[in-house]
Amino acid sequence: MKKKILGLLGVFLAIWVSLPQGVFAASFQIDFDTACAAIQLINLDTGTVVYEKNPDERREPASTTKIMTYIVVYENVADPDNTKVTISEKIRDELLGTGSSLSGIQVGDVLSVTRLLHCMMIPSGNDAALALADFVGGGDVQKFVDMMNEKAEELGCTGTHFANPHGLHDDEHYTTARDLAIITQYAMMIPGFMDVCNTRSEYYTVEGGPAAGEQRLLVTTNRMIHPNLDPQYYYQYAQGIKTGSHDQAGYCLVSSAQKNGMSYLCVALGAPSVDEAGNRITEHREYNDTISLY
């Protein structure tokens, strides 16, 4: 397991160090207003920061948190395809009344770690994130969260602190657009990560427990990659990665795209999700900002 972690980290650091000097300065001026509170757009081929807005402002990341959750699970489970997790009542009970996005897993389900990663990333299941954290933490979710913070520090993040594995509101749960870009670039090197993040929908079969054999459907929350969710936000060049939202965080989106032979990563945090009266804003300007920047 240590070899697995050190290998990935070594590749990440080698790529980071090899980027040309001076590439980190923003080099592109835009002629339109952006709604998100914090943004960073990076050319992944050169490492150039193409555009940024408040990149070091602390923001709640909502469910984009799950990018780090994925990393920590991957690095601490040797055989995720064959490692099974039984969903306990405490997972269900802890999320009651939180307004969580759920993947539909049920108490008693026996699922592989790989399946739970899909349940966490595709429909943004807080239930799956919590189940994974509880399992990897040996029944101690806080231990898992500590591992998330240790990983953030290891990657060089300076404005990040996690308080949970799913992204629900907590005053001590925050990151920056710059840090989240670092975290995401690391995650993108994990084998299979981008395949999961770019999945529009998939069926799976419950492996064990009372519902063994039942087929269930997972559908992405990412409007950029699924033309049938909300066509106005579909972007043909997009390739994942993760959405997130709650009232305190606003609408958040971490995405990647390939266009004109170049690869890009955009972190967009804090688009307005409620108005001054507390009414839900239906326009997703995190998508508008991101597509306009691409």
What name fits each language-model region?
Residues V23-R178, A187-P191:
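Active-site-adjacent loops and short helices of periplasmic peptidoglycan-processing enzymes
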Residues K3-K4, K53, K66, K242:
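A general lysine-centric signal
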Residues K2-A25:
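Sec-dependent N-terminal signal peptides of Gram-positive bacterial secreted proteins and lipoproteins
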Residues I15-S18, V77-A78, C252:
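Ubiquitous "structural anchor" signal
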Residues C157-T158, D171-Y174, R178-Y294:
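Domain-terminus/edge residues, biased toward the C-terminal soluble/receptor-binding domains
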